[in-house]
């Protein structure tokens, strides 16, 4: 049993149901695509795509059985628009967008499971250390010098907004970014 499956089993045992999954998985070791850092690519796909799939797979039997639930996928603005050095990362976050839409089509009306894809821009977390340690460090630091980023609480508040919407509706996508983020 995986850690995710164990967590779902413990939650089911304690509460008898799973109402919400916040599916947040991400790593971003940025590098130019021509560097061919294939092990980094594989790791990003494993964490950013397969990690999300494992979360879905773990809660799905419970949500299907109870005829309700809400899966919140934490994607990225990069899933809409790649950036230099982040091509593979952007591809993984585009996969999260595609999964979200597909889940909505398969699980929404037929099974009462809502799906929301939240796509944050820059959030002040350790995720960006992968960029800051790579060949883009100086450009990244200069681009963000003196600028405000989202706080993790901003993303949490966005999740709360989505999951507290009326049961008859679904907030399908939310793009949130700092005011200081141009793209």
Name every feature range the model reports, one short phrase each.
Residues 56, 92:
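Active-site helix of classical SDR
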Residues 81, 102-113:
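Active-site-adjacent segment of SDR/Rossmann-fold oxidoreductases
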Residues 34, 81-87:
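Active-site loop immediately N-terminal to the catalytic Tyr-X3-Lys motif
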Residues 113, 117-121, 138-183:
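C-terminal helical subdomain
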Residues 32-33, 40-42:
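Substrate-binding pocket helix/loop in short-chain dehydrogenase/reductase
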Residues 1-6, 38:
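The beta1-alpha1 cofactor-binding region of Rossmann-like NAD(H)/NADP(H)-dependent oxidoreductases
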Residues 76:
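Residue(s) in the substrate-gating loop at a strand-loop-helix junction
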């Amino acid at each position: 049993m995986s850690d995710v499956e164990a967590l779902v089993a413990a939650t089911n045992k304690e509460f008898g149901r799973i109402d919400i999954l916040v599916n947040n998985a991400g790593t971003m070791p940025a590098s130019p695509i021509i560097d061919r850092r294939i092990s980094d690519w594989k790791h990003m796909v494993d964490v950013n795509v397969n990690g999300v799939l494992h979360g879905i797979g773990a809660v799905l039997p419970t949500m299907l059985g109870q005829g309700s639930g809400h899966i919140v996928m934490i994607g990225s603005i990069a899933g809409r628009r790649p950036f230099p050095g982040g091509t593979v990362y952007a591809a993984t976050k585009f996969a999260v967008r595609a999964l979200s839409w597909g889940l909505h089509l398969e699980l929404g009306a037929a099974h009462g499971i809502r799906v929301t894809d939240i796509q944050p821009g820059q959030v002040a977390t350790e995720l960006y250390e992968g960029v800051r340690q790579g060949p883009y460090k100086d450009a990244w630091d200069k681009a963000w010098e003196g600028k405000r980023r989202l706080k993790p609480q901003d993303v949490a508040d966005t999740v709360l907004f989505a999951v507290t919407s009326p049961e008859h509706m679904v907030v399908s996508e939310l793009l949130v970014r700092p005011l200081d983020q141009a793209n």
